[in-house]
Amino acid sequence: MPKKTQQSVSFEASLQQLEQIVSRLESGDLALEEALNEFERGVQLARAGQQVLQQAEQRVQILLSDDKNAELTPFTPEKE
């Protein structure tokens, strides 16, 4: 069984945390301040996850391109 990279483990752990946050928010049992803190953490996790997915997509596009000499370069997301 191949080892997972640190990034994929981090992505999976972040996704699990995000799912837990969503469940807690949907329960409606949190105080307002706690709900806001959870929401803020969820937004941070979602943005980080989007960045990881964009980087993975770029790597796949490069690997599937016709240019056999294409090099992988670090992905720099556009700032909003």
UniProtKB/Swiss-Prot annotation:
UniProtKB keywords: Cytoplasm, Exonuclease, Hydrolase, Nuclease
Q: Pfam families, from UniProt?
A: Exonuc_VII_S
Any one GO BP annotation for this protein: DNA catabolic process
Q: Which InterPro entries match?
A: Exonuc_VII_S, Exonuc_VII_ssu_sf
A cellular component term, taken from the record's GO annotations: exodeoxyribonuclease VII complex
Q: What is its main location?
A: cytoplasm
On subunit structure and binding partners, the annotation says: Heterooligomer composed of large and small subunits.
Give the enzyme's EC designation: 3.1.11.6
Q: Report the locations given in the UniProt record.
A: Cytoplasm
Q: Which reaction does it catalyse?
A: Exonucleolytic cleavage in either 5'- to 3'- or 3'- to 5'-direction to yield nucleoside 5'-phosphates
What organism does the UniProt record list as the source?
Erwinia tasmaniensis (strain DSM 17950 / CFBP 7177 / CIP 109463 / NCPPB 4357 / Et1/99)
Going by the record, the broad EC class of this enzyme is hydrolase
Provide the function of this protein: Bidirectionally degrades single-stranded DNA into large acid-insoluble oligonucleotides, which are then degraded further into small acid-soluble oligonucleotides.
Q: Which NCBIfam families match?
A: PRK00977.1-1 (NF002137), PRK00977.1-4 (NF002140), xseB (TIGR01280)
User: GO molecular function, one example?
Assistant: exodeoxyribonuclease VII activity
Regions crossing the membrane: none
Output the superkingdom of the source species. Bacteria
Q: Which family does it belong to?
A: Belongs to the XseB family.
Q: Does the keyword rRNA processing apply?
A: no
Name recorded for this polypeptide: Exodeoxyribonuclease 7 small subunit
